[in-house]
């Protein structure tokens, strides 16, 4: 379900000393859907923290785009900002594009960003099939194992369960 073409833009600014945000997300695209996720987090005060984990899967001819930017302004010393985007391409015609950025104007910070795009591990698929798990079920299980990290970071138990059910229904 969902729109064929969608853009989701998140903008967060840390205006208070010691502000913290966890801005995670996941996407699961199929058909010819195109999703553009844009995230901009600005640290303007000191001792702020950002933790962002985005994971996604593109199947069929779907296209996913992630543009993430963390900006640490002058005077925002003590900032700890982490951004990760990891995606799976689940068909030959699917596409994932990613552009993670860190822009740092302060000196005393701990910041990191990372991006990976790949496919399911063929040896893991083979291993599961050799133990009697059908290929489609093995793909679904490995995809769920890849994405579940984002869901496990949801603090509210009820919301976490709803997200797990949502994911299971779509795999």
Located regions from the model:
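Conserved beta-strand/loop scaffold segments within soluble protein domains that form the structured core
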Residues: 1-126, 130-133, 147, 154-171
């Amino acid at each position: 379900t969902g729109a064929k073409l969608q853009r989701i833009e998140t903008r967060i600014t840390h205006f208070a000393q010691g502000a913290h945000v966890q801005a995670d997300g996941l996407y699961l695209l199929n058909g010819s859907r195109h999703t553009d996720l844009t995230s901009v987090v600005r640290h303007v005060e000191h001792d702020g923290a950002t933790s962002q984990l985005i994971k996604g899967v593109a199947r069929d001819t779907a296209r996913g785009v992630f543009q993430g930017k963390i900006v640490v302004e002058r005077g925002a010393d003590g900032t700890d900002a982490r951004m990760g985007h990891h995606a799976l391409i689940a068909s030959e015609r699917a596409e994932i594009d990613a552009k993670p950025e860190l822009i740092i104007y302060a000196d005393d910070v701990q910041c990191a960003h990372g991006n990976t795009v790949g496919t399911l591990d063929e040896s893991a698929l083979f291993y599961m099939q050799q133990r009697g798990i059908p290929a489609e079920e093995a793909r679904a299980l490995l995809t769920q194992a890849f994405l579940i990290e984002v869901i496990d970071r949801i603090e509210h138990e009820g919301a976490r369960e709803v997200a797990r059910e949502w994911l299971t229904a779509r795999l």
